Amino acid sequence: MVSAVYHPLADGTVREFRDYVAPDKAVIERLFGEKLAPGIYEENREDVAQGITEEQLAHCWPALRQIIATIPTPAALDSAYATIGAVSRLSEIGIDEEKAPELLRYAPLVRHRLTLLRLLPCFVME
């Protein structure tokens, strides 16, 4: 799924960059519920992306685009998954495909990692 997000991003559709802003606690509670939200808060207590600025992103963007170019395309991944018999669609694991954008937006909160997925809200697309 992320390959299908990263490649169009790197293909020149970024119009501007924004400073990173951590997700609002109310949004986390709505998405993860009362039971899971405390663990998500703890996981993100020291947000790995905090302090990343639009200037830093703009400066690093050419290098990030080169890295993205090394990621297999969605078609290549689909072919590989089919070859090994792996699932490749949310619907194959019982999740509605329409939930993909929201899942991609909030998936980075589950683990304390700095990924491009966590920074997606910093990219303003054309």
Predicted features and spans:
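Mg2+-dependent prenyl diphosphate-binding active-site environment of isoprenoid biosynthetic enzymes
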Residues: 1
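C-terminal charged capping/lid subdomain of soluble metabolic enzymes
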Residues: 5-126
